[in-house]
Structures are given as C-alpha cells and as structure tokens.
Amino acid sequence: MLLESDTQLNQKSYYEASVLRRAPEPALAGALSADVLVVGAGFAGLSAAIELAQQGLSVVVLEADRVCSGASGRNGGQAIVGFSSGQAPFEQQLGMSDARLAWDMTIEAIALIDERIARFGIECDRVAGYLYVADSARKARLLENDMKILQRDYGFASEFASGTDTQRLIGSQRYCAAAFEPVSGHLHPLKYGLALADAARSLGVRIFEHSAVQAIERGATLLARTAAGRVTAKFAVLAGNCTLREHGPHVAPEITPRIMPVGTYMVATAPLDPALCRRLIPSNASACDNNFILDYFRFSADHRMLFGGGVSYSTMTPRRLAQTMGARMCQVFPELKGVPLDYVWGGFVDISMNRAPDFGRLGDNLYYLQGFSGHGVALTGLAGRLVAQAVAGQAARFDVFARLQHRQFPGGVLFRTPSLVLGTLYHRLRDLL
C-alpha cells in the first residue's frame, strides 16, 4: 500500500514535470560482483557511490524504482544546517565536544553540495539563504533562544527580527519573528539527484533500476538477490530508507522498526510576477516555521511558489489535497488567493523516533543510512561521504553518528502509526499556542 500511494502521489510533481529523464537503466539480470553494493539510488546512495568510486572501488547501485523516484526527488528542496532533532540528542548522549563535531559536519554537508555542483557542472537552481519563522509570541521566544544558543555554543550566527521588523525579512503578517542565516538554502532536488547519478556513472558506477533487493545473505562476502539477478560484494550500504522494508522485509528487519514513513505534501503555483516574489521573500531564501507540523516554502527558478506542509501517518492519499494545501498557503500569503495551483504532489519520508539521523553497521561489512527526518537534502550527502570513509577504514566521523542510541517506534512496524498519531495530536494543539 505504501509503494502504491507513493507512486500515485508523485504523478503530479512539479519536479518531474520540469526535467527530462534519460531512458531507464536496465534491470539487473544475472550475476555481478563489486567491491561495494549500494541499495537505493536516492541522494544517500548516490553520494556514497560517488565517494566510494573516487576511492577507486568498484560500485554497483540497485534501485527498486527509478533514480531519485522517492523522497530525494520530490522534497522541499531545502538544504539545511543542523538536525531535525536539534542538538539535544547529541549533547545528551555524546557530550559537547562530539555535539559540536556533528554540528560542524552539517556545515560541511552544505559545502559538499556546492563542491559537487562545481566539480560536476550541475545545474540545479541553487540559492543560498534560509529563514526560520515563528507565528506566536511563545514560538518567537523559542526561536530567539535557539538562535542565541547556536551562536553561544556553536559559533553559528543569524540575523533575528521581531515585531514589525519581521516584515523586512518576510512579507507575511502571519509571522511575528524571523531569523535569517546565509549558509542553508534551496535547490531543485530532482535536477540535483539526476546529476549525481550522471556523476556516479562518469566515475564508473553501475546503476540498475527496477532492481529491488529482496534478500541479502550476510557473511565475509555479501550476496544480494533481486528478482532476476544477484550481486556479491565485500561491503554493502543500505540507503533505501522507508521503502527498504516494502521491497525486502527480511533484508534488515532489526533496523526498519526504528524509522517510520510519514506522508508530506507540496503544491506549486502558476508562475508569479517576480516583483510579487521579491515582496513576499525579499532574500529569495527558503523558509520554514518552527511548529511541530511544519509549513515550508520557497520560490522556484521560474517564480512559482512551492509550498509544503502537513503530515499524514496513513498510507492513504488524503482527500482534497489541493484545497487543503492551497488554504494553508493562503493563510501565510493571502496575496496568493486565486492563483492557480499547477502541481500538487507528495510522498513519504522517513523519520526516526528522536528525529536524529540513524547511521550504523550490521556486522563488519553491512552499513545503513536512514532517519534523515526532513533534513535529507544536505545530510544524505554527508552520510555518503562518512560511510565511504568508514569502508576505507577511517570510521571516526561515521562513528559519531553510529554511537547515537535509537529506539523503536512503539507498537513495532504494524502498530506504530496509531501511537504516533496520538502523540501528534498533542503537538497540533501546542502549535495553536
């Protein structure tokens, strides 16, 4: 059901409509061998493949659908420093020294995007700048305090505005405070992801689409099986996230209960007057509020408002999605009332229980990357670099994340959704305050 809903939700994606995909890669047939097998051709898997190939290793990537057909190719396009969890899990579990190291690596994650754009000549509408916004006095105080802590403990500076001064940063009466920082930003995720695949191919990586991994036999040499083929490898990286279990429930059953698929949705308006765009977001930054149920938005290169928000813990496609998302958008920007919505889409992302990324090993040679929790545009690139370093025997930075403890969702895989819905109802009420 999840895979069917995911495909259905992505049929009217602005991103898919604004790129020209190459012909599909063939499905795996027969037997292959490689130094490293990567499962999943999203940002994390492709990033790992690039880094591994740059080390001179032979790499095979198996993708169950098409390159970046999942969360990597249809997200908000916001490349953000930090973690969805905030710094608390890192400070509490690892101490301030490693918490600072983890934070600094998220700065590196943004730089890595720009490094790859420059090296491989990627055109993906990259724009720098990010706005955090708050819609109540309580949340404005929280935002200001968070920014002060980042400045004090991590040396990360931002520009804070409140009251009427907020309008200088964002042209919406809904918000009473905003913080701008120039490091994060936004891009066209599918353009970026398809270009990463091209970069991987240029380095000799072999990519197979429509090649879901159904099982992996573990040992000193790993053996992965698909419907029509098999791959033997010295190492493997699992980067399928919330769809990994759907294709191969027995591939890694010990880690799949630690993440949960959550539906999130977006709309794209018809192209707007550039002057209106400058009035609504003068810096052309991407933006996100600090509610538990987020609204996030930005402008595309062709002057469309791309507005995302809402979550669903069901695999069913929500009814009246266009009307619901359009209403949310117009609550933020009433000027957009009556503007046509040319595209409406959505799909599933993975979240961890504590919203911190979940990286680790299953034995000595099977690695996994999951739990990006809405910060995947930047963190997936970092994850790929770290896991490649670990495969090469330089695991210190990977192990900063691997030492984080992650709990399973209450109720396990089958009954985790009702438990999370109950918790979310509380936070929905908090968002109103």
Give the positions of each predicted feature.
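Glycine-rich FAD pyrophosphate-binding loop
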Residues: 54-74
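Glycine-rich active-site loop/strand segments that organize a redox cofactor
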Residues: 74-104
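Extreme N-terminal leader/targeting segments of oxidoreductases
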Residues: 1-36, 54
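N-terminal Rossmann-like FAD-binding beta1-loop-alpha1 element of flavoenzymes
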Residues: 34-61
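C-terminal catalytic lobe of FAD-dependent flavoproteins
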Residues: 315-432
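Active-site substrate-recognition segment that forms the wall
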Residues: 111, 119-127, 213, 221, ...
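Flavin (FAD/FMN) cofactor-binding and adjacent substrate-gating region
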Residues: 2-18, 85-91, 115-129, 133-195
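Helical element adjacent to the flavin cofactor pocket in flavoenzyme catalytic cores
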Residues: 148-149, 174-235
